[in-house]
Amino acid sequence: MKYLTVGDLEDCLLNKVDLRRQQISQAVEEVQKVVHHLTTNISNQDIRFQAVPYSDTYNENIKVLAPSQFLVTVPIKGLAGYREAREQHWRYYTLQGTRLPCPLRDPEGLQQWLEVEQFMKSLWQWHETDVNIDGDIVPAKVLLVFRKLVENAVRTCHLSGKVSLLGNRSAVWVAVETSAYQVELELVPAVEIPTTWSKKARWPRCLQRWPSQERVECIKSFGFNLLACSNYHWQLSFLRAEQVLLEQLDEDGGCRRKCFQVMRHLKEDIWCPGNRPVITSHHLQTVLFWTCEKYPHFKDWQVFSKAFLRLVRKLHKCVSQHFLKHYFVRNSNLFQCTNPTELDTVAQKLATFLKNPQIGPP
């Protein structure tokens, strides 16, 4: 069994982390060709959905949550000039068109309503009853339309042998066969809101020392997305802002990214393996951001072993408490809908690791 030494770090990074990067890059390359083909067909069927572009470098529409689990955001077209809702009002509708005696619950944390009137410009199709109820663009109805378009696209593009729609899920999931293994994709329609920062994201906090104020303004300029992944409420997402923050971690020469990469490798190989793990790369990324904020100085990230174990202790604390705040929207818990038993299993593995830190299985 190996202990955390400089030599082990080099071995882990070169032989494990780099190998993972190559495998993931190959999978992303194959997946994005399929996604571009599918979404181009979908866009031709319905102007409200935009094709996911093909990219030779980083594709901001594809987020790797685990080696075999990707999140793919499909841009929504025909909604421009977003503004925050001016006033709140009760909703009494159902997805079936009946009226409720009591109002629907208000959105919490990362959720919000979305009214078509919140946009200065909108295609007339967004006012149609297939996606709109009482002026609200309803994510469940958008997903229903989108799922049918995906089904048609799989048939039309002759991808039935390579792509299969996964049923019995409220979201739209497809399985894609790559040359190495099967990857499950969650295809999520997304309203992209560039240059505007959500009022729900009260960030940064007062007296926060990381990142710098200049970097904060840069990150906020990337805006946010609204994802259609529930019945009535849209979910806030900051994928672009998070990616920029992740890319610019170590300008001072620290080892933050190395710590993250090794932690992700151990999570995927030992602590929480599997196709749809309870802990994803996004959770690890959030733990990293919180730790960087608490330890903002270069001196805190000079020695890998100390910095890495500090990061793992933070992860263990969050998993044990079943509580991980979103980095930008702090009144939300990213573990709220996760399986507590699975979290406890991961917490036990992390506790064992921290008692005797090792970078590989027996």
Swiss-Prot record:
Family annotation (Gene3D superfamilies): 1.10.1410.40, 3.30.460.90
Pfam families (UniProt xref): Mab-21 (PF03281), Mab-21_C (PF20266)
Family: Belongs to the mab-21 family.
Protein name, UniProt field: Protein mab-21-like 3
Species of origin: Homo sapiens
Classification lineage: Eukaryota, Metazoa, Chordata, Craniata, Vertebrata
